[in-house]
């Protein structure tokens, strides 16, 4: 999954953002599971990228008023 930029996130509909957020959170969970199992991640910087992208999506959801949590 590609890391999203702010313009790409803003162009999405609220439903698309929700689906993308769910996919990103699942991917982050999988990366953390690899670390917890004692494995080495393929790309160590990926976890930070995922966290930042999730934060971007949530920030834009708040700005747009479509945040569900």
From Swiss-Prot:
Gene Ontology cellular-component terms listed: ribonucleoprotein complex; ribosome
Keyword flag NAD: no
GO molecular function, one term: structural constituent of ribosome
Record SUPFAM superfamilies: Ribosomal protein L29 (L29p) (SSF46561)
InterPro entries: Ribosomal_uL29, Ribosomal_uL29_CS, Ribosomal_uL29_sf
One Pfam family this sequence matches: Ribosomal_L29
Keywords tagged on the record: Ribonucleoprotein, Ribosomal protein
Membrane-spanning residues: none
GO biological process, one term: translation
Family membership: Belongs to the universal ribosomal protein uL29 family.
HAMAP family: Ribosomal_uL29
NCBIfam families cross-referenced by the UniProt entry: L29 (TIGR00012)
Record-given protein name: Large ribosomal subunit protein uL29
Classification of source organism: Archaea, Methanobacteriati, Methanobacteriota, Stenosarchaea group, Halobacteria
């Amino acid at each position: 999954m590609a890391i999203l930029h702010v313009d790409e996130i803003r162009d999405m509909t609220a439903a698309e953002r929700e689906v993308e957020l769910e996919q990103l959170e699942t991917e982050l969970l999988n990366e953390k599971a690899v670390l917890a199992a004692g494995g080495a991640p393929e790309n160590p910087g990926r976890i930070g990228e995922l966290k930042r992208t999730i934060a971007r999506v949530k920030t834009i959801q708040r700005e747009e008023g479509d945040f569900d949590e």
